[in-house]
């Protein structure tokens, strides 16, 4: 059983943050919806593997080309910016040092993803490949596309995944010591992001990562509810 009360570890009286909480709540809700859309797209239209396959996909359907190169994942990370800011504001009084570190890791992870995503470049190369007059020109564009895909699946992407997961684990640990968010929210955050790092388990890593998305989706739903409560100046104190 739970009851609503004015929390003592956040500035509910400071209405300056209410808009941020509302924006973060909307962002988290949109992200939860996008996760479902991404799963459907992944099942119905598995992403290509080679540069030439991406070129053909862009030529057939540009939108599917961008979606295959994680357009919605980029949008997720844009929406993560207000979410991280709101989490910092809500939890900074519980442990400001941890929250500064977590926010910094999260923003570096977002920047790494933005820097590594090759969607626009691959779209341009696809158009040039289609317009090429000779086989030599087409080979040149194919040779340019493969390194882009390799780089995207390389250091920057993994840095984004690792830093983002660590950031949300740290934030979730801080949640455990706060009455601002439920314990269930904290545990979902820890579980989903620890499992995400299971990507590096040989052979089954990708399946562990995909499994983690279920718990991440639940986490987004729970933080959505909490942000909307905070936007009203309320927090949930869970009786355990």
Regions picked out by a protein language model, each given a short descriptive name:
Residues 2-240:
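Hydrophobic, aromatic-enriched alpha-helical segments typical of multi-pass transmembrane helices
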């Amino acid at each position: 059983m739970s009851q609503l009360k004015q929390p003592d570890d956040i500035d509910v009286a400071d209405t300056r943050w209410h808009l941020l909480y509302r924006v973060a709540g909307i962002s988290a809700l949109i992200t939860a919806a996008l996760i479902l859309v991404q799963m459907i797209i992944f099942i119905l239209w598995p992403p290509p593997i080679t540069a030439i396959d991406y070129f053909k996909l862009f030529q057939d359907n540009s939108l599917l080309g961008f979606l295959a190169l994680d357009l919605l994942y980029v949008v997720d990370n844009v929406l993560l910016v207000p979410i991280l800011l709101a989490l910092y504001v809500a939890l900074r009084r519980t442990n400001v040092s941890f929250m500064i570190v977590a926010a910094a890791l999260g923003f570096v992870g977002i920047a790494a993803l933005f820097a590594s995503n090759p969607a626009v470049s691959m779209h341009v190369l696809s158009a040039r490949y289609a317009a090429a007059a000779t086989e030599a020109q087409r080979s040149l564009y194919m040779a340019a596309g493969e390194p882009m895909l390799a780089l995207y699946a390389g250091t920057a992407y993994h840095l984004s995944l690792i830093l983002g997961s660590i950031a949300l684990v740290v934030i979730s640990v801080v949640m455990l010591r706060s009455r601002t968010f439920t314990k269930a929210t904290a545990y979902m955050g820890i579980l989903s992001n620890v499992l995400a790092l299971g990507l590096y388990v040989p052979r089954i890593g990708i399946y562990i990562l995909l499994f983690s998305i279920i718990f991440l989706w639940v986490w987004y739903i729970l933080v959505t509810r909490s942000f909307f409560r905070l936007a009203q100046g309320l927090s949930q104190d869970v009786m355990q």
